[in-house]
Amino acid sequence: MNLESLKLEDLDRLTIRRGSHPAPNGKVEACAMEAGFLRWAMRQGWDKSRIVSEWSDSMPCTCPVIGGFVRSWNDGISDDSVRTRLFSPGVLDMLPGTKGGDALMMRRMWMAIDWSIRMQTPAFLRLAQLEACAVALEALPEIRSLEALSNARAAWEDAHKHGAAARAAARAAAGAAAGAAAGDALAPTISALQVSALDLVERMLAEAK
């Protein structure tokens, strides 16, 4: 897509790319946050020169917690088609205007921490056949405070210890021939986490309502 001839409706077909990108000099390439900025700027009626001069993947009007999570998640997806499907126009259009006060930002921060400990980590523990550790983390109460995080420390440290041992054993045993099989085994977990991460973003967005 070329910025000079770009129309708002064209952005629904924009491929969401990995990493940050320079301001468009003709061809438009954008990560999820940059695409969210571009959609917002065009809806505001900005001219092309202003879009270029203020191009950003960190919109001031976007919650820093949501922005940071989206950037990290965006770059963790290796497939352009999967990334573009997950960061749909509807999701991108919800990113601007999400910045709130410190209390709202803290609630969203705890939501992200809770997701990482009770959902993301158990998924990878199961890949290492550490079912007991995965179940222990999933059984933790929702983590929404320093006290809850402190109470989760023993289960987290146990999972981290066993997970480190499993990673070391896997690296020692892995060979070139196992690469494809390992990728196949990982795919369902990655797919499930992508859906779960999208749900987290939508919950963080809804937290202000």
Q: What does each of the following model-derived ranges do?
A:
Residues 1-175, 179-209:
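Short, glycine-biased loop/turn motifs at secondary-structure junctions and
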